[in-house]
Amino acid sequence: GYANMSEYRLNGAWSADTGSLASGDTVWTGSGWTGQPLMMKWPKEVKAHMNMTEEAKADDDLVEVIYACMDGNVYFLNLKTGEKTRDPLYLGYTFKGAGALDPRGYPIMYVGAGYNSDEGTARVFVINLLDCSVLYTFGNNDEFSLRGSLSFFDGSALVDAETDTLIYPG
């Protein structure tokens, strides 16, 4: 939609600190230039099974901000307050691009590393958001890649719910 915003000014409601990730001679900080936070209002039935704080589970209006950053962490925050909804998930790779949530409502996140790290070659992570466990990884050794060993995932995944297809260009 459209709105007349000529008299309105944006003000920061809160901010969240991130760390840094060193890999070789490089240090990554902040969030990537294509990185956008994901936001989700989880159904109460789903939140009951998630590893969220009790306050987050009890908040019927909670919109969770999920933000993969260049320090190797995925952060989980309350959109209204900026408070943590759960502990950060450390994956050890820099994330420059936005992740994606499964459009069918499954608590699954797809996020790809934007650069290699001391942990190994960049790859895509499929994350179970009930307990923040890694369900699957792929893309780190793509024999069909035209870019050789450059398996960086700076974009965002697309999930076609109708055909149960994941598209994640690297």
Annotated model-derived regions:
Residues 1-170:
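Noncatalytic, solvent-exposed loop/strand surfaces
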